Amino acid sequence: MLLDQGFLLLRPLVVEQGSSILFCCLLADRSCDIAEVFASQEIIRHTQRNWKSRNVFKPCIVGQMSETTVTLPGEKSRRQHVSGLSFLIQVSRPGLWSTTAMFYLMPLGHADFLRSGRLWLGLFFVLFPLGMLLYGVNDIVDTEGDLLNPRKGTFLFGSRGARGQLAALRWQIAFVQIPFLAAFYFLVGPRILWWYATLLLAVGLYNAPRFGWKGRSPFDVLIQASYLLVFVLSSWLNRSPQLPCQAFVFGVLFAMHSHVFGEVMDIEPDRLSGRSTTATLIGRVPAKLFIAGLLTIETALVYFYFRDWIIAGFLAIGALWFVLDAGVLWKNRPYSPVEMRLFLWGWNIAALLGIFWNWSHGTLTRLNLFSGLQQ
């Protein structure tokens, strides 16, 4: 048999080292020809088992046999496409979609979701194209820092792109804005140009390489007021009244405490990358107490100006939680990756409940003052 002929080509060589004897095998000149005959991996594995059973010969193939997977060109293209799409979705921060949707839907109150094409157009825009612009530029600028961040590379916390993906991202961000800019110009009018100009200014101020506000406290927190542009776009696009100024203040404070919470989770990678944020400057415990203070002000706003006991109660519970976090629970200890994921899932559940409550009651769309405040 051909397999037996292969064995005849092997001759043992015994090498003594101390008390151990190493058994090696040398192939004769025809070994390459025999190896080509043994193209089937199953035959090679069968040969290895026969060699081992004789306890004299050791296979001439050193190391573990590698598994070879043949990928068809069409399948490879599909995999690359799926991988690229997953990366773009991660860039848009699905972990923050519920919060962004809550901001977009807040001015609309009890809107008719089923019959409003404008509503769905704007909702898709703020979740994906706007998310790509806001966070994609940040990912391009923070390439080195994201490599040190264990949160990155997930759908919850954002992307960690390869060099080629990040190089193409800037053009993908610009390309995806074009159809929406045209649609909004048709639906909203020339004022959408001012909206986009303000948005680009905020993105530029935050991410500029030398003087970017993302590394300059307290501007890294104050720039979060730009999220109010979502309120403005929603009202324009859906022909709804703008929210009361107290609701705008609430939105600013909410965006600020959300951002500081993200900075608290990123203290270690930010310090390693040399990035200075409000959380890295004041420390983990003071940052948590700062979040609690912002939530307390939000609670007072909702309680006194909108008289919504449910929203005010949730905000008060959040303020109490961060006080306990800073003083009793975690204190100065960093969150683990599992804890951060649980926190963000809880955050999303709370945001979804807020969306439902706003759709049911719409209390933040109109003032409902106490008699003393009305006077």
Task: Map each language-model feature to its residues.
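Extended hydrophobic alpha-helices typical of membrane-associated regions
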Residues: 310-375
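Helix-coil boundary and interhelical linker segments in multi-pass alpha-helical membrane proteins
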Residues: 106-124, 181-193, 231-249, 301-310, ...
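Membrane-embedded alpha-helical segments that form the functional core of polytopic membrane enzymes
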Residues: 102-141, 193-204, 242-261
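The first (N-terminal) embedded transmembrane alpha-helix
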Residues: 90-109, 224
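Intramembrane alpha-helical segments
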Residues: 84-89, 155-242, 327
